[in-house]
Amino acid sequence: MASLKLWVCLVLLLVLELTSVHECRPLVAEERFSGSSRLKKIRRELFERLKEMKGRSEGEETILGNTLDSKRLSPGGPDPRHH
């Protein structure tokens, strides 16, 4: 009886997977490329985006500088009675 329930579940999952509709947009707008040229184009786009993001992050660092570094010193060292 348990094996029958298992088979029914597996068949239902298989039917659901085969009949489900996946709607997603393609990574690349043009779909007429072959497999290898499509991968090359995707890789090139990813590298361009990575360079752009690195440029942005480096620009933010130069704008902020070291303003986030704390230059505060404890007046008498760490408090031994703290905690």
From Swiss-Prot:
Disulfide bonds: none
Leader sequence segment: 1-24
Residues bearing carbohydrate: P78
Disordered, as annotated region: 53-83
Keyword Lipid biosynthesis: no
GO MF term (any one): receptor serine/threonine kinase binding
Cellular component terms (Gene Ontology): apoplast
Keywords: Coiled coil, Developmental protein, Differentiation, Glycoprotein, Hydroxylation, Secreted, Signal
Residues recorded as bearing Hydroxyproline in the entry: P75, P78
Biological-process GO terms, alphabetical: cell-cell signaling involved in cell fate commitment
Coiled coil: 38-58
UniProt similarity note: Belongs to the CLV3/ESR signal peptide family.
Name by which UniProt lists this protein: CLAVATA3/ESR (CLE)-related protein 3
Organism: Arabidopsis thaliana (Mouse-ear cress)
